Amino acid sequence: KEEEETEKGGEKREEVENEIEADDYGERPSIQKLPEVEGKDESARIPDEYGKALVSEKFDCTPKEFFKACCSNSATNTFFLTQSKASGQTNFSCTEWAKHSHYGFSRDVKFVAPVNSTFGPKETRCVQTQTYKLYPDDNLIIGYSQVQLDIPYGDYFSVESKWNCVPLFTEGDRKMNGCEVTFHVHVLFEKYTYLQSVIQSSVLSETKESAEVFLNAAKDVLNNSSNSKSSAMSEEKSATFLERLSKRFSIDVT
């Protein structure tokens, strides 16, 4: 009976831990159930066709904290919507994260974006599928797949983007003390056009600029959150010290 109770207790603890993680990530399954990728190097999880990172930034937070602040369900109508408006996008809509058979989780984003081009429409409808997967080593991969419905040759290609969020550790005790986020893009052509090189160059330039703006905004949000936590902890310590002082010397500190 003791062994059975111990096993049941272990199962309950595991369920609770999964529920805590689910609060941060939506209905995320156990990490162990997600498909593994061969190779220990995190870069192996970014296919070769994506090439080198266009943008890279380090953060004083874990990959989970980065996700929660910028990409979680709770961040959709705050950080994510703010970034959409700042980019000039309208008619923004976003579903919640749902389980995906291969990528872990996915959601659909729709919006109307301005077009920076001398010819064609001034704006276009965009449909974007986002995915994410968290690996056992805390490496987080967030993927975007976007098509633009109203631009010339819009049905010829899709823009495939990946955010690679790799945890950083201190030397010696190997304690996680931050993460590095790199941004990779691949223009996937479904049909041939003689304008492929022009389209690819334009996409890389625009997505790099957007990624830089996104990461700078993410850093501001995370820094503000960190400062708020530090301030709250400092106030709590001061209050506790004053309470101890008051009790010891019978001093009224109110």
PLM features: what roles do these ranges have?
Residues 100-161, 167:
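Hydrophobic-cavity lipid-handling domains and compact docking modules
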Residues 186-230:
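A conserved amphipathic terminal alpha-helix motif
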Residues 1:
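Phosphoinositide-driven peripheral membrane association surfaces
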Residues 36, 176-178, 233-234:
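Beta-rich interaction modules in large eukaryotic scaffold/regulatory proteins
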Residues 136-202:
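Beta-strand/loop substructures that line and gate deep hydrophobic ligand-binding cavities in soluble
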Residues 8-118, 254:
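Hydrophobic ligand-binding cavity/cleft-lining segments
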Residues 227-254:
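Terminal single-pass membrane anchor helices
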Residues 67, 71, 166, 208-219, ...:
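Amphipathic alpha-helical interaction motifs in eukaryotic regulatory proteins
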